[in-house]
């Protein structure tokens, strides 16, 4: 059992609305598709209003080497991770006083949009006053499922060490993977969806001292479930080229969600003798409008139970693994909470895979 006590976030400064993003896509792809106007409707109909990027949109019109893009990834990810962690450990909405860095026993660092060895959390520990004995657990390659998986693995750590405080950092700079020479439909659709963002969550075990928490009710993680769909590597992921990360993005993802997810959720709920009616809220990774629609149709949920996911999609688009932490933060600050009510945290990612967490609202301090 583990509690989510706080979430901090950090966004790049370059805010791009969908109209401007569609103009960019037209410039980049107009000579590659005869039906470009139809394809560009994805920008208008995707329920995304704006996204944030680490570079001005004009920068992405030119080719950049993988070396250049990855160096930017390291620098910007470190900067935004630092800001997200600082906010997470001292957010006035969540704490009466800041949590000392040396209290953090382990750091899970999650990403899939760049490479760094030593990994980013090691660089972060050189810039912030963490204990040198802090355990480092980098997780790479889970894509959009990574944030939920990071929460699940951190909760398992807290179960083993119930007095521990643990950080989960999810950092994704999706825009740096854009390849202007890639004129595929997958790249165009990806251009309509993905944005950049970093988030950090603080979890603690049941026996940790939570007296500084301001939360009247906090999510207490009860259990998690990981599921892999076999022989589905081609649904989403990366091809690695001389230019960097080339997106793999199947158009069948919403259909797969609709057909595959319900059974997995049902098995998870059955394990705890629960039904869909017992779930008050679904804090889901909003992969896109069609994915949210598939959640609603497949699980028979009301749109209201996915309101935080829809809100984050509108404001920031799909930030891969970081997105789910933004969704949880939105609900912590703005959502309805009632003691002992249960909810789900969920995300889907490369594999093709599903990560689910069951939680209940319990007294935070």
Name what the model sees in each region.
Residues 15-16, 118-122, 149-152, 177-182, ...:
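Short acidic, glycine/serine/threonine-rich loops at helix termini
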Residues 139, 149-153, 170-196:
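Active-site glycine-rich loop that binds ribose-phosphate moieties when present
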Residues 112-114, 131-133, 138-159, 258, ...:
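Claisen-condensing/thiolase-fold acyl-transfer catalytic domains that form or cleave C-C bonds
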